[in-house]
Amino acid sequence: MSGSEFESLEKTLEKHIPDAELKEVKRILFGKETKKLALPACAVEAASARDFELQGYLFEASPEQLRPPRTVRVGLIQNHIVLPTDAPVLDQITALHKRIGDMVDVAAMCGVNIVCFQEAWSVKNEPVCLKTLLKCRFSAMPFAFCTREKEPWTEFAESAEEGYTTQFCQKLAKKYNLVVITPILEREEIHNVLWNTAVVISNSGSILGKTRKNHIPRVGDFNESTYYMEGNTGHRVFQTQFGKIAVNICYGRHHPLNWFMYGMNGAEIIFNPSATVGGLSEPMWSIEARNAAIANHCFTCGINRVGTEYFNNDFTSGDGRKAHKDLGHFYGSSYVAAPDGSRTPGLSRTRDGLMVTEMDLNLTRQISDKWNFKMTGRYEEYAEELTRATKHDFKPNIIRE
């Protein structure tokens, strides 16, 4: 069975492990059992009719005497490119927006308050550029940064404030009263520079702000620094009606200090919109966001795209392999992790999907009070050592005979 045919780890465990042992296996792998969330019949029927997976789970906190529950529902959306890559561009643009609109519609049926799309999901759809885009065979921004080609991929970059994708998401936010996190390829017009950016749109429909990818990969086929460099927005946290949220884009999940700084700035939920493939990172995927939730007393949400994307021209990986036309299989498997170490099952590795998760944000403080990682963190000592380690004349503290 190829990686692109293997649907999910959870379903394989359920298929092959006896029930008596399965519960313990899941407890060890995934933490305490996450309760299933009852979803409206209309949403379940709509997801089935629109051919995408719908899952719902619940993280509870202990009742408190002085604080009411702070219940929030988040929706994670993973999706393929909609039409074949040789379909007319305008048809693909229409199809993709309909697809995402249909999935957000179901999220709204489920009472979702915050929805997040996968990394670089957006399309370019401004009339002034349509003639140029007729050369391109993708509707969604494919993860084309493996190719090192500038054209036509840079044509997908757009303004974070005024671009069509932002306007499209503003309408969704206002229509459904939800916060939308929309990762795009941004063109900053003042300096004419590209960035990998996530725009955060308030449930009022206004733009709350944007944040840029802090860490840029130079590994395998991920040649992203050919297009954009490390972000310059720091570790912004956005105060929304539904809690304080942050966006740690893709490769940033490999850097513990990146998660740490979002947590230090007060994030209660950190989203990790990604585009990553099985041959490179899948063994790490189920671990990293969960570890970050534990270490930083917060909820984390990993979102990954699905499918295999093929390009017209061959490209190489710098590893001696023959030139090839695809990056590998994007394995989906989006999930949510809680500060107590528990996590939801992942969405499918092969299908479009919507993960709806209800969480009580009171759990973040309760777990912080229990484990005291921030109290016992000794940040001042580490700050001093890190400062020394960044100096050109740093000498490691190694004791020898």
List the predicted regions and their residue ranges.
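Active-site catalytic loop in hydrolytic enzyme cores
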Residues: 158-161, 167, 171, 176-178, ...
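Active-site beta-strand/loop signature of hydrolases that rely on acidic residues for catalysis
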Residues: 74, 103-152, 173, 180-181, ...
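N-terminal active-site segment of His-dependent metallophosphoesterases
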Residues: 57-113, 271
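Short beta->alpha transition motifs characteristic of CBS
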Residues: 129-130, 140-148, 199, 210-217, ...
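Short beta-strand scaffold segments in enzyme catalytic cores
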Residues: 182-184, 196-200, 236, 302, ...
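C-terminal beta-strand edge segments of enzyme domains
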Residues: 1-69, 304-401
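Acidic, glycine-rich loop-and-strand cores that form catalytic or ligand-binding grooves
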Residues: 292-301, 308
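Short, acidic, Ser/Thr-enriched surface-loop or helix-capping motifs
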Residues: 126, 201-203, 337-338
